[in-house]
Amino acid sequence: MSIDCNVVENVRYSRVLLKVSGEALAGERGFGFDQDVIGKLSCDLKKVRESGVELCIVVGGGNIFRGSSTSFGFERASNDYVGMLATMINALALQNSLEDMGIASRVLSAIPMTAVCETYIRRRAIRHLEKGRVVICAAGIGSPFFTTDTAAVLRSIEMRCDAIFKGTQVDGVYSSDPKKDCSATRYDKISYHDLLASDLKIMDAAAVSLARENSIPIIVFDLGKENAFSEVMKGRGTFTTISG
C-alpha cells in the first residue's frame, strides 16, 4: 500500500485534540482493527504533526467492546471498565503504527497500567506535547458512567487545546441518523444549545455541555475518507462545526 505522507501546510491551529471512535478503526470489518485504516490514519496524523501542530488523541473502544449494562450480565460500572480496557488496546495499536512511521508518541492511561504505559498526569501530558510527541489518552477519565467523548472534552480543556476534532463514520452532524433516514440533512454549523435541544446523538449531553462551558469548538467529520483529518485542519472537506 502506497500512502502519501507529505507534510500538510496552512493549518489553522497550534494544539488540537482528535477523538477517534473505535468503530472508525474497525473500518468496514465492524470489529477489531482494519490495518489499512490505522495505517492511513497514522499517515494523516504524521502530516499534521510534522506541520508543527501539537496533537493529542483520545481513542474509543467500540470496535472491541460495546453493549448496554445488561448485554453480558454485567452491572454498568463493570461494563464501563471493560470498555476502558478496550481503549487501551486501541491506543497501543495506534502508538505502534505511529512509531513505525517515525512519529514519537506516548500512551497515557487514566487507570495506572505501568507495565505498558504512563499514568495520565496533566503536566506530564502537556510536557510531551511541548516536546513534539503525540499524546494518546486511554481509559477514558478512569471512572465509570463517563463516555470517551466526555473524556475527550475534559482532556482538551486540561491541555488548553484550540479545538476538538471528532472523527466518526459520518461526515458531520445530521438532523437524524443518515443511515436510517435518507431525508436527513447535514448542518455546516450548529450551536451547542441547538444540538442539545434537538437531542442529536453525535455526542453525549455531558460532553457537549462541558465544551459549551469552556467555549471549545467541536468539528465532526468522517475519519474514513483519505486525508480527512489533515484536510479538515485546513478548513477543507465536509464537516460540521459545533460552537457558540
Curated annotation (Swiss-Prot):
Belongs to the UMP kinase family. Allosterically activated by GTP. Inhibited by UTP. One of its GO terms (molecular function) is ATP binding. This is Uridylate kinase. Pathway: Pyrimidine metabolism; CTP biosynthesis via de novo pathway; UDP from UMP (UMPK route): step 1/1. It catalyses: UMP + ATP = UDP + ADP. Homohexamer. Residues 27-32 are annotated as: Involved in allosteric activation by GTP. Keywords: Allosteric enzyme, ATP-binding, Cytoplasm, Kinase, Nucleotide-binding, Pyrimidine biosynthesis, Transferase. It comes from the Bacteria. The keyword Zinc-finger does not apply. UMP binds at G61, D80, I141, G142, S143, P144, F145, F146, T147, T148. ATP binds at K19, V20, S21, G22, G62, R66, T168, Q169, Y174, D177. The keyword Ribonucleoprotein does not apply. Its EC number is 2.7.4.22. InterPro entries: AceGlu_kinase-like_sf (IPR036393), Asp/Glu/Uridylate_kinase (IPR001048), Uridylate_kinase (IPR011817), Uridylate_kinase_bac (IPR015963). It is found in: Cytoplasm.
